[in-house]
Amino acid sequence: MGVFVAEIRPRWSDMDAFGHVNHANTVTLLEEARVELLFGEGSRHGATAMGNGMVVARLVVDYHTPLVVDGTSVRVEIVVRELRAASFTLDYTVHSGRRESDAVVATAETLLVPYDRVAARPRRLTDAERDFLAGYRAGVRSA
């Protein structure tokens, strides 16, 4: 698998008074890509427990250049940097367009913790979740 790539289309309403996508809306773009990976791809690969609960424990975003809404989608790349028993870290690269060669507008990381909503506490990753996430580890090449 390697790098997960999502194409997300920013909305006109994502822009602020300065004519670029507001920083908070950039976080929403990250969320949309993450949901596609964890709940979309994860479910298709048997990691269905992710849909039961996942919380963001930490979020860091570095903004490199303004992102302007021009009607095209942006490329969001995600890799798993760290995989632990009860948490994992995702790294994101957001490009200004659909191509890998388009300018990088932001990089980010999230620390995610699987969460048992019934018990109201964190839980360990299942074997299926670990196997799925391991396919997106940084440095793993796509087949």
Residue ranges and their predicted role:
Residues 6, 68-72, 81-143:
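HotDog/MaoC-like acyl-thioester-processing domains
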Residues 1-58, 117-143:
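Hot-dog-fold acyl-thioester-processing enzymes
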